[in-house]
Amino acid sequence: MGSTKPRPSGKNSISHAQSLPGKTFIIDNGAYNMKAGYAPDSQPLDDEEIALSACAAIPNAIVKTRANRTYVGAQIGTNVTDWNEMLFRRPVEKGYTVNWEAQKEIWENSFFDERTVRSKELHIADPEDVTIIFTEAPNALPALQKNADEIIMEEWGFGGYLRCVVGMAKPFALNTGPSLNAWNEIQSLFEDSVLSQPRAVASPAECLLVVDSGYSHTVITPVYRGRPLQRGIRRLDLGGKHLTNYLKELVSMRQYNMVDETYIMNEVKESVCFVSNDFNRDLERTWKGNRKRGQPDPTDGVVVDYVLPDPNGGKRGFMRPHDPLLGSKKRKAVLAGASAEQLNEDVLVLGNERFTVPEILFTPSDIGMKSAGIPDIILQSLSVLPTGLHPAFLANVLVVGGNSLLPGFMERLETELRQIASAECVVRVRRPKDPIRFAWLGGSRLATNKEELKKVAITRQEYQEHGSSWTTRKFSGAL
């Protein structure tokens, strides 16, 4: 493991006042990918694509290949060619950073070491000249929060710091990772044209119900004027990781043993899975769609083929329409003297696995979990809030996280919410263009509002004077 270099702490004296550094670096520290980059120096950029060009998605993991080579962070996406039997070490578990030794190595490799940083736009040359915005999942344990504060402010010595947390001391906490989404231009997503005019100073949406379905879990966060309502936060311990593991189990029981092929099966999931809006109909199509023997029917059937990657041939995996005659074609090819390369093709035939795997997000009881699905948990979240706020939140449901990209996810969520919500409420469910980096984008807009950032962030001087316990109270809204 690479050593983390201690950062100098004597540059700024505690004896005189210190303001937040001008540069702000945001790290949305996800369990699967980190979303990181510098915020713009002045007013927020109106063009979302240009603003997101400053944000890089970096694997938050250390991997070991079957050739016993180790890759860290950004190296994974550029240097790895053989994904078979890849071993992953992730510092974030269940949404919380629990292994700071691994996390420090990934950060050092991705942001501090000039030799390994992907680009100069991600390089942090002197942390004392940078304010860092660091996100974490709601309701983290105090010990984990303290670890983050001490490592970021004492080992690296950043000049300014904001840890986006949910506070327990007040019903309106300062910030959470999900609440950063409220700082984006939400109105245009919900067709509120009167309110969607460009603003010189970034400000949060008034009412927003954030559904964050990511790698480790799904979290429902009601956000009021940029601040999360603590008692309304609900969590479903199902995320993309669980979908991948479930798909691995199903495929391993029915076809090849894919238990050790986590990365490959994650690629399969992202390529072929979808959320069914008529489960019984799709289940019937699975076994009836290709019932005419010898005649492939890709238009009616749900069944598809996924060709597994071939690292020796430098080929990536891909999905294609199911060919029920594939076996007989291969036998004929052998008789015709086809080359080994043409025949050496491993194929997964996927039918009901395509939609039964994502179905657990809506009916966790399918895998024995005694929990409600996402739509019911949204209603549970609203049930503890004033009734007068329900229409505003249901009319502004924002879905972020990688699972929202599954085809059919948005339609299914909106349909089920309409069925169980009050008839008087208008239900609008929207997803931004980039649901994975949307929280980072909100953080960058917050960073351009210098006055608001001063209220919620702390300086290095304040940390040195008051310590970690004071920092925890500050970020929890107790000060």
Swiss-Prot record:
Localization annotation: Cytoplasm; Cytoplasm, Cytoskeleton; Nucleus
Sample GO molecular function, one term: nucleosome binding
Keyword Transmembrane helix assigned: no
Entry GO CC: cytoplasm; cytoskeleton; Swr1 complex
Pfam family, one: Actin
Keywords noted in UniProt: Activator, Chromatin regulator, Cytoplasm, Cytoskeleton, Nucleus, Transcription, Transcription regulation
Subunit and interaction comment: Component of the SWR1 chromatin remodeling complex.
PANTHER family assigned: ACTIN
Record's protein name: Actin-like protein arp6
